[in-house]
């Protein structure tokens, strides 16, 4: 739990927060932004916000001052970036629809293609435009152990392997995008740069920019920023003509807010007690089930012998919509509020209205300690998606 975070159970100004609710903490976001500002001041690299991980646009005015722009993976993300963030918009998608690309071109400064086939299909569309075209490359290295999140898994559909280029960089390609990390450290950054030089080094003199993608968890404890700055600087010394870019998503929103929920029922079984909540893991925190991982709950701990063991039950009818196990210092009661920590990245951008479950509101805890409610959802939001 952050030192800034306020215990909502003891603060009357915050006890009236709606439940469920995603709550961004402004102070923590600003602290993360300062880390990336330091990076850009100390190393020859520019940082973009990856909207696929964090697209909470009411806070874009704060981020705009310290970042170079935003990266998008679809027409709608590109439009959001252009309309709400401004500055440069870099677009990459695994495939482009023929009716989307003409709409993307006026919004984007850079468009990256996933395959040689996509580039050859659409290259004429970029003629007589100011858009810089790129290729996504596959460096054939990723430290990610979970295949669901590993873009370099054997047979990956993402990116061009060096063998596919066969020594010939297509005319018109001005840069490369390499996205092979996920919540990774400074050593993975170093290994990635080495792989790019090893497999694609012959093409680096022919391009203008290199985008190192996302997955650089520079805002986590244990990330050696000085080491990363040195690695980036040394790479740039070897390739001084290259404009270096990265586009973190999770790292910008890392540990900057929580999801508030309420205990609605308690179901006792011989093995454990189900604490039934007004949130759904499958609908509101899908990465918890997909990865899977056990999210931190404020005030909870791993059960020890003699503890009452709680399994947290989601609000949907999916049998597997639960997580556990947890223990608390005091027995839970119906009406208690639970806080899931670090729920700003890859949550709001992935939520669904599966089963018609109530979608969490969205708000912000400002530096002043005041809470601002930014968005609520109702029946019409569920209904209007379906017809």
UniProtKB/Swiss-Prot annotation:
Assigned keywords, A-Z: Decarboxylase, Lyase, Pyridoxal phosphate, Spermidine biosynthesis
Transmembrane annotation, as ranges: none
Recorded metabolic or biological pathway in which this protein acts: Amine and polyamine biosynthesis; spermidine biosynthesis
Single Gene Ontology MF annotation: diaminopimelate decarboxylase activity
Key word Membrane present: no
Known catalytic reactions: N(1)-[(S)-3-amino-3-carboxypropyl]agmatine + H(+) = N(1)-(3-aminopropyl)agmatine + CO2
Annotated positions of the N6-(pyridoxal phosphate)lysine modification: 52
Domain of life: Bacteria
BP GO annotations: lysine biosynthetic process via diaminopimelate; nor-spermidine biosynthetic process; spermidine biosynthetic process
Disruption phenotype: Deletion of the gene leads to substantial accumulation of agmatine and CAPA, and lack of APA and spermidine.
Entry cofactors: pyridoxal 5'-phosphate
EC nos: 4.1.1.127
Pfam families, A to Z: Orn_DAP_Arg_deC (PF00278)
Entry function: Decarboxylase involved in the biosynthesis of spermidine via the carboxyaminopropylagmatine (CAPA) pathway. Catalyzes the decarboxylation of CAPA to form aminopropylagmatine (APA). Can also decarboxylate carboxyspermidine and carboxynorspermidine, but not ornithine, arginine, lysine and meso-diaminopimelate.
Family assignment from sequence similarity: Belongs to the Orn/Lys/Arg decarboxylase class-II family.
Record's protein name: Carboxyaminopropylagmatine decarboxylase
Species annotation: Synechocystis sp. (strain ATCC 27184 / PCC 6803 / Kazusa)
